[in-house]
Amino acid sequence: MAESSNKPFRGPVRANDRKANRRGAARLAAVQALYQMDIAGAGINDVLAEFESHWLGSEVEGEQYLPAEAAFFRDIVSGVVRDQTKIDPVLDTALERGWPLQRIEAILRAVLRAGAYELERRKDVPAKVVVSEYVDIAHAFVERDETGMVNAVLEQLARQYRADEMGPK
């Protein structure tokens, strides 16, 4: 894994950035929760309760994290769990041949699943914002080549789910 910080959503916030940063913090927390569920086999109710009571907006290792938009966090995690049997085959198709979803790192699976869910279901968020946010999250955990793969897969899904919004290549 990359040596970069896994703490991208901290520090001073301007008032007009607050909503975006609360959503960014919710996305990061959702990816971490999905990762925990994948690796540890934790159940959704336990993970949601743990993150909502101990992580969202808390001080962790001496760093104060922005409060996350809890409803947005819950929607992403619950939506991915609910729709995973639909999301995973779409991701398998979008990934390069020979690299099925189960073969890539668990953190990348979590990033791609959350991004795919948001692109398909959260039409209130512009597709370019979704792609950019999840690429930024991937940067916190993996090397540059892998973030390029995240960008390529999510761009492909954005064109599939939101062709009218994305326009021509």
Curated annotation (Swiss-Prot):
Pfam families: NusB. The keyword Repressor does not apply. Signal peptide: none annotated. One of its GO terms (cellular component) is cytosol. Keywords: RNA-binding, Transcription, Transcription antitermination, Transcription regulation. Disulfide bonds: none annotated. One of its GO terms (biological process) is transcription antitermination. InterPro entries: NusB-like_sf, NusB_fam, NusB_RsmB_TIM44. The keyword Endoplasmic reticulum does not apply. Residues 1-20 are annotated as: Disordered. Involved in transcription antitermination. Required for transcription of ribosomal RNA (rRNA) genes. Binds specifically to the boxA antiterminator sequence of the ribosomal RNA (rrn) operons. Belongs to the NusB family. This is Transcription antitermination protein NusB.
